């Protein structure tokens, strides 16, 4: 797994390369990260990467040539390692919403090249010539694509075998297919009673079937309350059991009473 990032701020990526579980995995060689500054691919003394927009308007636009040259260098470096050409992902408000399914797909591949835009955006001709995918974190605007790229890489890298100490941890994440795309249940640790609030009794029972059912019901309860569209999606995909449906019907009755 190799990620390449085209960015004006390569130092920002030390956060995912050097810290936490992703940093440990990087040190172990489970994935690699290479940053490419488009200023290194300019032809003028000022290392210019942006210019005024045609048609007028506020702000500046990132120029196509330095970005395309940086992508070409990244693809060449990948080819030298025997890797196939990578998808080129532009972080953009116009992109498809990144989710756990996208992270899983990304983790199953050999990596990607992320384009981190700045200013008002990037020249459309670069997008049409080089970009294969556009992705977004959500309906809000950041100062640049770096934070989005960090989040997307973190979500994908933690799914790689050997990255997490317990390989089953990722299976219990919210939105994971192992949870049928639902939200995860609440978690508790020591002490058994905190500020007068005890750990729920089923978790102390040692009865694995009861614990599993309690967690499933709490997952259903939380998802129905916070993200009801995920319940409908799971239902439409046939992921809800008869016991799940009975519990949800009971929740609906509670809300009506």
Curated annotation (Swiss-Prot):
GO BP annotations, alphabetical order: tRNA N1-guanine methylation
Whether GTP-binding counts among this entry's keywords is no
As recorded in UniProt, its EC number(s) are 2.1.1.228
Keywords on this record? Cytoplasm, Methyltransferase, S-adenosyl-L-methionine, Transferase, tRNA processing
> Mind telling me which CDD domains this protein's record contains?
TrmD-like
Which locations, inside or outside the cell, does it occupy?
A: Cytoplasm
Q: Which reaction does it catalyse?
A: guanosine(37) in tRNA + S-adenosyl-L-methionine = N(1)-methylguanosine(37) in tRNA + S-adenosyl-L-homocysteine + H(+)
Q: Does the keyword Electron transport apply?
A: no
Q: Where do the TM regions start and end?
A: none
The protein, known as: tRNA (guanine-N(1)-)-methyltransferase
What is the originating organism of this protein? Bordetella parapertussis (strain 12822 / ATCC BAA-587 / NCTC 13253)
